[in-house]
Amino acid sequence: MYGYPVTTVFPPVSIEDFLSLSIGHWISLRSQFKCSSIDDNWHSSERGDIKLALGPSDNSNTRNLAISMGSQYAMKLEFFLDGRLQSENCIIGTWQIWPDGSLELSYHDANGNEQCERIWFMKTNLRLRSTVAFNQDGTLRQASFCSEIRRVTKHKL
């Protein structure tokens, strides 16, 4: 069952459903726009590989998601069932599942910059993600959009 979502609930209605649907290997194409850049580097587009896995939880009030970029471990996000979010990388914020099944994350990074991220599934193997980042003074710093396609493995019969 490797590479396939565990849940059959679509669109997801809970954080458990959303995280379960997210597990696996994803191919990501990201377009990023930096608002502070005055030269030709204001826009970039890059392809990457993301691996998402459910991690063990210390208690029944949290759900953990381990995120790896390529072959490198990136971070673990801890989703508290009361809507709080934190990571070992000093990210502290909140999460919310919307009625359309999308997940909204709002958090501050280690530098105090605010980021708002929305992730939603078009199909079980196609995720979209938009992120808007603000400077500490509230001005727009950057925006990005990702389309992510799940890598699936053909099973031999």
Swiss-Prot record:
Main location: plastid
Pfam families for the chain: CpeS (PF09367)
Annotated EC: 4.-.-.-
Keywords attached to this entry: Lyase, Organellar chromatophore, Plastid
Subcellular location: Plastid, Organellar chromatophore
UniProt name for this protein: Chromophore lyase CpcS/CpeS 1
Family the entry assigns: Belongs to the CpcS/CpeS biliprotein lyase family.
Name of the gene encoding the protein in the UniProt record: cpcS1
